Amino acid sequence: MKTRNLTLVLAGLAMLGPFATDTFLPSFPAISTHFDVSSVLVQQTLSVYLAAYAFMTLFYGTLSDSFGRRPVILASLLIFAIGSIGAAFAPSFGWLLFFRGMQGASAGAGRVIGQAIVRDSLAGAAAQKMLANIMMVFGIAPAIAPIIGGWLHVAYGWQSTFVFTFSVTVLLALACLKGLPESLAVGQRQPFHPGNIARNYWLALRHRAFLLRSLAVAFAFGGFALYIASAPHFILELLGLPETAFGWMFIPMVAGLVGGSALSGKLAHTVKSAVLVRWGLLAMAATGALNIAYNHWFAASIPFAVVPVMLYAFGMSLALPGMTMSTLDIFPQMRGLAASLQNFVQMLVFALVSGFVAPLLFDSAFKLALGQASAVVLAAVFWWLGSRQVTGQGASAIIKTT
């Protein structure tokens, strides 16, 4: 498969998660009314999804190390399709939460296994460039998903957003059946021994550099995720915009993602990964300070309230390809496992931000700015601490257990 086509397929698989997260955001008030539940309880449809997503990322990489990349991806798409159509016709709020959990449990496979496929197929700057290109294409999803969701909601009701994600899943499954190659040869697969797998996870979590770098990636993304989780309140209440106006936040956000990813990919062969990470973290820190200053002195309004969100996304997408690649490379023989754990930590932080942090902060634009700045400070501290650790010791320990 050509590199360009592989990039598009992997980006499409990675986009499935943002579609499931963002398409139904404009429908939060309608879901609250339909099931007669509070807005805080509706927020848990996002938290349940993210918690299931985080938990299952622990298994997809390991399963793909044992059974191959392609079969696990195809199985996950089937489960996601069932969850999507079930959510569309959920008879009660409890069933909606159940089917959202099914979506979350399967949405992460493409993202996790896609990272492993990149590292199976490419190395060094070429791998970093593909990861950056995937992020650039993947970044379109958060922009178009809430816009599509808003128009679908207005035209057909909140259930139509889940019918839409079902349709996208079917198209992705057809694309994978036709063109996704198997990147892990049978001779390279790891035996499926649950005891050894559990020990491998434990050893990886005890590897300080891996854990610290995974936390750095998670909190760098967490400052971005805070605004995604708070989007219904930020856009509909703080900015006073209608359901069809989610593009005011998500289009600038994705412009930053695409711009940072494009620059990261362009510089991958000429600038060291560590330097790009440093530049990205500095950009995020400067943006956090700007966001605090703006919301301290002025009331949040369009277009100025979304500029810091765009700049933060730019810095994050400049840094994350290098941060992700160096984290996975700590365990070169078990990249599926490493990708699972790294994504588990990232999505666990996202779930905590969505379920607990966002409800504490989304009533104030200034509080959201403080939350974003705190996230980048934590990311920088964890990355600095992780960079000081000696890497490689966990890799040899894990190889011996298989």
Which positions does each model-derived feature cover?
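Conserved MFS/SLC helix-loop-helix module at the cytosolic interface between two early adjacent transmembrane helices
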Residues: 55-94
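Extracellular/periplasmic helix-loop-helix junction of adjacent transmembrane segments
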Residues: 27-55
